[in-house]
Amino acid sequence: MTEFVSRHIGPSEVEQTQMLNDLGLSSIDELVRQIVPDSILLRGDNKLPDGCSEHEALTELKELAGRNKVKRSLIGQGYYGTITPPVIQRNVFENPAWYTSYTPYQAEISQGRLEALFNYQTLITELTGLPVANASLLDEGTAAAEAMILAYGQSDRKIILVDSKIFPQTLAVLETRANPLGIEIKLIDLEETPDLGDISLAFGLIIQLPNNHGKLRHPDGLLRCAEVYKCMKIAIVDPLCQVLMQPVGEMGFDIAVGSMQRFGVPMGFGGPHAAFFATTDKYKRKIPGRIVGQSKDSQGNKALRLALQTREQHIRRDKATSNICTAQALLANMSGFYAAYHGAEGLKQIANRVLRYRQLLLSALKWCDVEVDESEGFDTVRFKGKKTLEDFNVRYEDGWTILSLDECTTCLLYTSDAADE
């Protein structure tokens, strides 16, 4: 304990005085004045209140937070209400054994953690119909950008075609990553006939399923054209919707990415949330991030390890194909446990309930003579007019009101005083 104290607790007042004397200084303030430039040195009263105890600070913060009017968010766009099973919240989300181990430095020692991540990867491959998945990435935007860069490396072309109804935050990340690489992003409207000339010049095609308006397209013709012109096909797909729809791998996509947030991970004011990345065997040595693989130990027993690490920068440095080792292991494990908790049939029930509520809301709006968008979709309702919903946050776009339903949805009611704006 004595050694720990001397190494990890700061110097005492006596030691501070001795160090100042050795420097020929009389106080820490004098030391600061000699180091910090005058232009940024804080002088005089900082106008901060007196210090208080932790309990007093928490009490005041709770009082301030209580002034907020909390509304249910139905904005969607990759962020949805979800129910975290109490057993996962207590034993994983709130358990330091899970949440402090943010990345497996000595991975093979932690076989339990690797098994949980292996379970997550298996979930992703079963959902997407693609054979290889990594152990998560930072968010959907990052995963989409990594998919773009993987596709870019397979061709000498410079153009990527992107669904114009992609989530805006994902498009922003794509633009940020594309600019320094000289990649040109060309937005396309999937509701119009694609220009074959555009496809022939592009190295990749990114489609959001469902899109920003909640529409669920089946771009079979576009995918066939992309295949002919050797244009890689990337799907950004909602995993809960994927439970009910044909796996994107079977549709013909080469890469699938998306956010696992709605698999039991709280919205958390926008994050953090685990993103998934799945692809074909052809690109398994180009896939970004960590991959957990199954092997055998020295006694021949099944053992898990981090696989294909020659892709990563701590092995190959400048020749690495993966320069992103940080993952969202805690949130990936939560979503994997969420799927195990509910099972395949439970996930289908949740997804079908969301779809059923969407259909009920559409019917109710039409009964009230409200113009609605009846395009095929999963969880999003789009109707004409701008309605004020007292207890909900929704989207308004070009004269339309847009809201997305989720696992927490039970019944949506317009109050009698809801008004057109």
Which residues are covered by each model-predicted region?
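Active-site C-terminal subdomain of aminotransferase-like
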Residues: 263-368, 373-375
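Conserved PLP-enzyme active-site core in the AAT-like
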Residues: 142-145, 149-301
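Short loop-beta-helix segment that forms the pyridoxal 5′-phosphate
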Residues: 105-109, 113, 121, 125-145
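N-terminal entrance/gating region of PLP-dependent enzymes' catalytic architecture
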Residues: 37-119, 315
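Conserved PLP-binding catalytic core of the aspartate aminotransferase-like
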Residues: 366-390, 405-408
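Gly-rich Lys/Arg/Thr-decorated short loops/hinges at beta-loop-alpha junctions or inter-strand turns
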Residues: 96-107, 125-129, 155, 202-204, ...
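Charged, compositionally biased N-terminal leader segments and the immediate start
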Residues: 1-11
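Conserved small/polar residues in nucleotide/adenosyl-binding loops
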Residues: 414-421
